[in-house]
Amino acid sequence: MLGGSGRVIMVSGASRGLGLAIAKRLHEAGFTVAAGARNPAAVAVKDRLSADRYDAEEAGSAEAWVEAVATRYGRIDGLVNCAGINPKVRVMDAGEESLDQMWRINVKGPLRVTRAAIPHLVKSGKGRVINVASLAGRRVGSNVGYAMTKFAIVALTHGIRQELWDSGVRATALCPGYIATDMTAGETEVSREDMTQPEDLAEMVETLLCLPNNLSVAELLVNCRKESML
């Protein structure tokens, strides 16, 4: 197993929710964490934990963030693409504004960060990319727009694995169900107590980052309740 000492991991969406829980967990485990957030001032900066502005909707934001992290630390060993949104978009809904925004943030954002970081991940020899997808990326519920973006991020993850495997880069699509964060605050189908806790999921992310090159997980499906597909 790989450890955290000396390894630099970028985490997007790190100012709240799951991204914040992941950043905290990795920092506690000895990783150097580079947090990316629209409001970096919301991140409590400390030794081995920096914060930079990153907006997944802005085309140049990914490159600027990666450059800042690489300049600061001299290396990048992994990415956790966690930034995302989930407005309701049904098949018959008029207008495409919300759908387009989800594609920019949930799909193009992770793609841009990964592209910018690839030279550093390859140089690491043990580069890691963890894309936070969803069980909505494995089966479709009422929010078809969200599911479309999460199916796409699973596809992106497999594309990264295929193209960069021989360079030592490993990628995992993490597919959780309901997580007890502000994104699910309005959900009534599952109680908050029954939802997966972000701190528990963050521990799984740490484990994925510590797996050696010859022990790679392509997809990790995580459910908090009985699912027809699991």
Predicted regions and their residues:
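Conserved glycine-rich cofactor-binding loop
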Residues: 15-16
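Conserved glycine-rich Rossmann-like NAD(P)H-binding loop of the short-chain dehydrogenase/reductase
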Residues: 29-45
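Conserved NAD(P)H cofactor-binding loop of Rossmann-fold oxidoreductase domains
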Residues: 82-87
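Substrate-binding pocket helix/loop in short-chain dehydrogenase/reductase
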Residues: 90-91, 98-103
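Active-site helix of classical SDR
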Residues: 114, 149
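Residue(s) in the substrate-gating loop at a strand-loop-helix junction
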Residues: 134
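C-terminal helical subdomain
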Residues: 166-169, 173-174, 190-230
